[in-house]
UniProtKB/Swiss-Prot annotation:
Signal peptide: none annotated. This is RNA-binding protein KhpA. NCBIfam families: PRK00468.1. Forms a complex with KhpB. Belongs to the KhpA RNA-binding protein family. Residues 29-75 form the KH domain. Transmembrane segments: none annotated.
Length: 75
């Protein structure tokens, strides 16, 4: 799922080399930390957080197959 977030984020930003994704696995959940360059933060979040919410929705749909809870944090 980290690769999914990374692919989406790289398509959105101007500086794709600065995109970093960290996965922290818990017992029933996965936390995905997405780090982008400060100047690209607005592009990943979007107006009123719509793009960030869309990314979270896609990742949650992918997580249903694994029966895990996924949290996407944009840092």
């Amino acid at each position: 799922m980290g690769e999914l977030v990374k692919t989406i984020a790289k398509a959105l930003v101007d500086n794709p080399d600065a995109v970093e994704v960290n996965e922290i696995h818990g017992h029933q959940s996965i936390i995905i930390e997405l780090k982008v360059a400060p100047e690209d933060m607005g592009k990943v979040i979007g107006k009123q957080g719509r793009i960030a919410q869309a990314i979270r929705t896609l990742v949650k749909a992918a997580a249903l197959k694994e029966k895990k809870r996924v949290i996407v944090e944009i840092i």
